[in-house]
UniProtKB/Swiss-Prot annotation:
GO terms for biological process: gamma-aminobutyric acid biosynthetic process; glutamate catabolic process. GO terms for cellular component: cytoplasm; presynaptic active zone. This is Glutamate decarboxylase 1. Residues 1-13 have a biased composition (Low complexity). The lineage of its organism: Eukaryota, Metazoa, Chordata, Craniata, Vertebrata. It comes from Sus scrofa.
Length: 594
């Protein structure tokens, strides 16, 4: 509201008396506060704020009248909604004698349902609050056998008879207690981190709606949201807004599989009906640093992992284009048909961006399908400062982009984008008559489910759409820029310190910062197999101590012939420089006696 003074229409004599406001003439400050506290939170705060700024009873009365009129015109909850207040007020409830059968749709089950869900919401809100509290642990680690044996009454076994709602609430608390707070500002273990509150609200709504994404008939709003969002993502990639297709999938591995299926169908459509026996020997190409899902898709789709050819990378983890072309020519000489090249925009370990422009030139030269796996790096397309790292992505035939990684959307949220419209539909449709009837009363082109390899499909779009509405493209851009700035901060802090050693030279391209912690016993020791063997054991030991203490989490792994090293990744917008400082200090503390 721009001004505390209501418009003339709210007080005009022509409007007549408002039956909802004519009795709002309290004569004391306390009475006015009572009115404010009886309203919805947003409205109540506005009224309380006004009361502190003015002593005019006339103005107070006019303000409340105007607020109530505005709320009513927008069909929002008003101060008079006592029915809502009564139904959703917490009351003392004995859940030890209540069971699932006592909740809706049970007769007279509304009150028990409301009280049970209020308790669940209280558990969830307490968890959310603690997630952002740096004094809380990232995890309370227990070994598998401890959880299986039961921790303080937390029993994972299933029973034949129902347990009380009291026990169900305890189970909810314990499930969160013994899990990992992946939204904690000091959780750096995976590419998917953070806990976005808008996204959380979206996921709650999605679960409440409990619908499926196969037809417009049962998910009209969600289907339209998905189409609009996918179109926007394709435009950001750089394709014409009239071109292309796409769908949300259960994750980047499945999105990558879609890309291989689309490529195969594009060049050999007969494979859909006749199978792999009807097509030549096909080979796929991907970098030695690419995600393992490409090889997994090769196995699942009948190519065989031997026919997924790995391309050499340079010291920064980028494809060497000359080796790609050499491997293509070698395959052709052996009688194979090169089909598909996967370029990675943001590798899992190094965060490297393959040279897409050069790879695209080779694909055009030999008529190969070019896919860009931007599951991790796709978020940088939202940043004007960093999108140049994906230069050439607009030349790709398909793109994998996981908003649940760099953009902080809650799991799961992965998109496969395809430049040519119709390929996904042609490749996957089976025209199931009980779902995809052609004679429905609406435009059946909105029944998008038949282009998916699934039948049932979770609604992944709403939380993402809602976050985009709440943040705007600029909000995502700022969030991504901040994470990359934190990676630069970490690199600058440790690159010249004797207790740390960088895995490769130069600033990281993404938020992946790869380094060894060098304990005192290995500092100044010349490189040798014995030193590498000892160094290989350092990161796992520190990680074990880290998990036992529960203070932070960061991943480690080997790469090629390199000893285990820490791979720090930042995708949580809640993280700050102080969290980076804490991580460095914690690694030093835990590793000082190794």
């Amino acid at each position: 509201m721009a001004s505390s003074t209501p418009s003339s229409s709210a007080t005009s004599s022509n409007a007549g008396p408002d039956p909802n406001t004519t009795n709002l003439r309290p004569t004391t400050y306390d009475t006015w506060c009572g009115v404010a506290h009886g309203c919805t939170r947003k409205l109540g705060l506005k009224i309380c704020g006004f009361l502190q700024r003015t002593n005019s009873l006339e103005e107070k009365s006019r303000l409340v009248s105007a607020f109530k009129e505005r709320q009513s015109s927008k069909n929002l909850l008003s101060c008079e909604n006592s029915d809502r207040d009564g139904r959703f007020r917490r009351t003392e409830t004995d859940f030890s004698n209540l069971f699932a059968r006592d909740l809706l749709p049970a007769k007279n089950g509304e009150e028990q349902t409301v009280q049970f869900l209020l308790e669940v919401v209280d558990i969830l809100l307490n968890y959310v609050r603690k997630t952002f509290d740096r004094s809380t642990k990232v995890l309370d680690f227990h070994h598998p056998h401890q959880l299986l044996e039961g921790m303080e009454g937390f029993n994972l076994e299933l029973s034949d008879h129902p347990e009380s709602l009291e026990q169900i609430l305890v189970d909810c608390r314990d499930t969160l207690k013994y899990g990992v707070r992946t939204g904690h500002p000091r959780f750096f273990n995976q590419l998917s981190t953070g806990l976005d509150i808008i996204g959380l609200a979206g996921e709650w709504l999605t679960s409440t709606a409990n619908t499926n994404m196969f037809t417009y008939e049962i998910a009209p709003v969600f289907v339209l949201m998905e189409q609009i969002t996918l179109k926007k993502m394709r435009e950001i990639v750089g394709w014409s807004n009239k071109d292309g297709d796409g769908i949300f999938s259960p994750g980047g591995a499945i999105s990558n599989m879609y890309s291989i299926m689309a490529a195969r169908y594009k060049y050999f459509p007969e494979v859909k009906t006749k199978g792999m026996a009807a097509v030549p020997k096909l080979v796929l190409f991907t970098s030695e640093h690419s995600h393992y899902s490409i090889k997994k898709a090769g196995a699942a789709l009948g190519f065989g992992t031997d026919n997924v050819i790995l391309i050499k990378c340079n010291e920064r983890g980028k494809i060497i284009p000359a080796d790609l072309e050499a491997k293509i020519l070698e395959a052709k000489q052996k009688g194979y048909i090169p089909l598909y090249v996967n370029a990675t925009a943001g590798t899992t370990v190094y965060g490297a961006f393959d040279p897409i422009q050069e790879i695209a030139d080779i694909c055009e030269k030999y008529n190969l399908w070019l896919h860009v796996d931007a599951a991790w790096g796709g978020g940088l397309l939202m940043s004007r400062k960093h999108r140049h790292k994906l230069s050439g992505i607009e030349r790709a035939d398909s793109v994998t982009w996981n908003p649940h990684k760099m953009m902080g959307v809650l799991l799961q949220c992965s998109a496969i984008l395809v430049k040519e419209k119709g390929i996904l539909q042609g490749c996957n449709q089976m025209c199931a008559g009980y779902l995809f009837q052609p004679d429905k009363q609406y435009d059946v082109s909105y029944d998008t489910g038949d282009k998916a390899i699934q039948c049932g499909r979770h609604v992944d779009i709403f939380k993402f759409w809602l976050m985009w509405k709440a943040k705007g493209t600029v909000g995502f851009e700022n969030q991504i820029n901040k994470c990359l700035e934190l990676a630069e901060y970490l690199y600058a802090k440790i690159k010249n310190r004797e207790e740390f050693e960088m895995v490769f030279d130069g600033e990281p391209e993404h938020t992946n910062v790869c380094f060894w912690y060098i304990p005192q016993s290995l500092r100044g020791v010349p490189d040798s197999p014995e030193r590498r063997e000892k160094l290989h054991r350092v990161a796992p030991k520190i990680k074990a101590l880290m998990m036992e203490s529960g203070t932070t989490m960061v991943g480690y792994q080997p790469q090629g012939d390199k000893a285990n090293f820490f791979r720090m990744v930042i995708s949580n917008p809640a993280a700050t420089q102080s969290d980076i400082d804490f991580l460095i200090e914690e690694i030093e503390r835990l590793g000082q006696d190794l």
